[in-house]
Regions:
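Acidic/polar surface patches and capping/hinge elements
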Residues: 116-142, 156-161, 408-438, 452, ...
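Peptidyl-prolyl cis-trans isomerase
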Residues: 62, 94, 98, 153-201, ...
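Sec-dependent N-terminal signal peptides
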Residues: 11-19
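C-terminal motif of bacterial Sec signal peptides marking the signal peptidase cleavage site
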Residues: 21-24
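Bacterial N-terminal signal peptides that target proteins for export
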Residues: 2-12
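N-terminal targeting/tethering segments
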Residues: 26-110, 114-116, 250, 254-257, ...
Length: 517
């Protein structure tokens, strides 16, 4: 609660970038199109594709003098190997098919939200102007938090008699282990954008020095005292500069409200019920499985293989056929649910039982919600939408490249003899920062990795040269030279990644970092 500021989601960036990518993929340019930076067989790399890939690519791939050119060559390498992967049928591999199915589900859910929620949102100019005007008012406040209403009102009554400062100082003095002081409970100047709407509604009319009655917020009770209020003017120039930013802010605030309403209205008629006993068994089994030092098997595989030495997992095994989730006219057994559930989506540590179970409940709800959303999206033909098809193509190409790379390098094995020779030939690489030369035995794993990477790189470069003989590769240098990218020393040394907030997946694939190792 120390920092009441909220941040505006970065989804607008993700949405904008995905729109650009899908737009680029769907275009049918001729070879003379000035937007094309390269041609690889029947595949085209647009200036937009290159720019996005470069900006969010790994920093160590941009160290050469002719950075854009060499980065483009990496993209061409991947395109060539990807095309060869398709020829070899690697797009039919289990790994590619599984990833494709998972991505399709994500894209269908996103597309359904876009159609049902985003397309219905209109932000009027008057709303934007009013939001900008409201942002000229700033509050500075201090607060106190209690976990229950009774304690909060007792402290509120004490503050009405003795004042905020004296009461808080006495509480802090009697609890020195908390290691806090008054400054820890103060904010800087906040606008209406920084304060949760339900809190702002309660404090907006408070006078300076006035203490609010306890305000329930996210399961706790807040006492707030306004210490200062400032108001500033705003010019027409300020309005113009702030217009687009505030339009985005209002859009995403409205999106959050409408999305919640859409989910509620969509799911309530399904009458979904989760069985409590089966949930406890699942929570216990998942907790034990996650505490293992290594898990080569999936969670479901571990459960199905459980024996008497694993009583918690065995109990789960014995209940796989039990009904876990019911909804209108249908139900799921525990096993049917696990076939749709990703146990790695639970990030909380098992020892934090309360948080672990809270996240598990949330992910169960998301799994059920997405199941229904995907069915709805397919029934409306969204699996054939341009955005979904284009994104599947982009990622499938990446996965097929990865399969091709694995296909050609899988036989590379580095034994101790080869590793020892590599170490002797590159001994200076392993000297420590304090100038110590380590023994081979101390760095053998790293040496084997380095030797493997070098062999794989040479092998792939040879294969790529062979592929170029059968595929037209053309670079439009004139277009490449016109592409503007971040090119400062700082940007070249910093990795900047863009992830989707909904899934944690990269917003789009970028060049494999292995090319620069």
């Amino acid at each position: 609660m120390r920092n009441l500021k909220t941040t505006v989601t970065k989804s607008i960036i993700v949405f904008f970038i995905l729109f650009l990518i899908s737009n680029a993929c769907s275009r049918n340019e001729s070879e003379s199109d000035p937007d094309m930076v390269a041609y690889v067989g029947d595949r085209k790399i647009s200036a937009r594709d290159f720019q996005l890939n470069y900006e969010f690519g790994f920093a160590h791939l941009k160290k050469t003098n002719d950075r854009k050119y060499f980065y483009l060559k990496y993209m061409i390498n991947e395109a060539l190997l990807s095309q060869e992967g398709y020829r070899l049928g690697l797009d039919k591999s289990e790994r590619v098919k599984n990833q494709e199915a998972q991505l399709l589900e994500e894209l269908l859910v996103e597309e359904l939200f876009r159609k049902k929620v985003d397309e219905s949102i209109i932000i009027a100019d008057d709303e934007i102007k009013d939001a900008i005007t409201k942002s000229t008012v700033k509050w500075k406040l201090r607060y106190w938090v209690e976990l229950n209403s009774e304690d909060a009102f007792n402290i509120y009554n004490s503050m009405q008699v003795s004042g905020y400062t004296k009461v808080v100082q006495e509480i802090l003095a009697s609890n020195p282990e908390e290691n806090r002081d008054l400054k820890d409970l103060e904010t800087g100047y906040l606008t209406w954008l920084d304060i949760p709407p339900e809190l702002l509604e309660k404090i907006k009319d408070l006078e300076i020095g006035e203490i609010s009655k306890p305000i329930e917020l996210q399961g706790v009770y807040l006492l707030v005292q306004i210490t200062d209020i400032t108001r500033s003017g705003i010019s027409d120039h300020d309005y113009k500069n702030a217009y687009n930013r505030f339009k985005q802010i209002l859009f995403y605030r409205e999106q959050k409200v409408r999305a919640a309403s859409f989910v509620t209205n969509f799911m309530n008629p399904k009458n979904v019920i989760t069985k409590g006993n089966e949930f406890k068994i699942l929570a216990n089994a998942l907790s034990e499985w996650k505490q293992r030092s290594s898990n080569s098997d999936t969670f479901l595989e571990s459960v199905e293989q459980a024996g008497k030495t694993e009583p918690v997992l065995l109990e789960m095994k014995n209940n796989l056929g039990n009904t876990f989730i019911t909804y209108v006219d249908e139900d799921w057994t525990v096993k049917e649910f696990l076939n749709r559930f990703d146990p790695h989506s639970i990030k909380a540590k098992p020892f934090n039982k309360q948080l672990f179970r809270k996240q598990l409940k949330h992910q169960i709800a998301i799994t059920i919600r997405n199941y229904f959303f995907v069915k709805e999206a397919i029934s409306e033909g969204l699996d054939r939408s341009e955005v979904v098809v284009n994104q599947l193509d982009v990622w499938r190409n990446k996965w097929v490249y990865e399969e091709a790379r694995r296909f050609y390098t899988t036989d590379i094995k580095i034994d101790n003899t080869e590793a020892k020779k590599y170490f002797n030939d590159h001994v200076s690489r392993y000297v420590t920062q304090i100038g110590k030369q380590p023994d081979f035995s101390e760095v053998v794993s790293q040496v084997k990795r380095d030797a493997y990477i070098e062999q794989a790189k040479r092998l792939l470069e040879t294969k790529i040269e062979q592929l170029k003989k059968n595929s037209l590769v053309k670079i439009n240098r004139a277009v490449l030279d016109t592409i503007t990218v971040s090119d400062s020393d700082k940007s070249r040394g910093t990795n900047v990644f863009l992830f989707k907030s909904s899934s944690g997946r990269l917003a789009f694939p970028t060049v494999d970092p292995a090319w620069g190792l």
